[in-house]
Amino acid sequence: MCLSDKFFSTFVLSFAFLICLLPGTLYAAHGVSLDGTLKYPAGFDHFDYVEPVAKKGGLLTLHALGSFDKMNPFTLKGTEAFGLFGIENSLIFETLAVGSLDEPFAAYGLLAKDIELAEDKKSVLFTLNENARFSDGTPVTVEDVKFSLDTLKSDLAHPSYQMYYQDISEAKIEDKAQGKIRFLFSRPNRELHIIALQMPVLNKKFYTEHGFGSESTADPLLPPVGSGPYIVKEVN
């Protein structure tokens, strides 16, 4: 196809102008850290402190003080069951990235396989792992991620989430087919992209069907759908 010099010049200038309007990328990587250095390379199999050929199967009994009356750990009312989601025990729900116990202030992609921090540090773009699945077999999508942020920042969730994510102004789906979603920040903060990575991802279909928090009409002990390594088989 032939293009006139005039058209080609106009196209190049227009394209260059468009590029200037898009957020510049500070870096794109499989993980992030506050100082910009990572211990583990892209494609690493396991953390050094993990036994990669650990025996599978058997029975593990864990204990916790007190009782529980709900299976949703993200609401204020009630007491959730131990191990659903937490800093040390996230057996049911997963986050966009996971921290390394032998490396301070670093996180590696879990549900997200690629992390791109904008040059102005006012947004971060996540590309989801196409192999990520919930326990019901459905894929983890950008719609689930957006639903999670919107829900956790709403009055339906525990107030601590509103405070923690207050500087994340919006989750914007950029490419549904490619699994790309951008978190926009209200102000530059060197820790915000790490904070965003710590957000648990909820199953939109499950909580739309059964409700969330005060809007839920389901049994509070209904086993949840998560993407973590374990499922809740039954509640006694």
What annotation goes with each model-predicted range?
Residues 29-119, 150, 211, 222-233:
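N-terminal lobe/hinge region of extracytoplasmic solute-binding protein
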Residues 2, 127, 162-210, 229-234:
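Surface-exposed binding/hinge segments that line
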Residues 56, 118-121, 173-180:
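A short, structured loop/turn motif at beta-sheet edges
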Residues 117-132:
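Periplasmic solute-binding protein
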Residues 1-8:
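N-terminal secretory signal peptides that target proteins for export/translocation
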Residues 66-70, 131-133, 152-155, 188-191:
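Solvent-exposed loop/turn segments at secondary-structure junctions
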Residues 11-24:
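Bacterial N-terminal signal peptides
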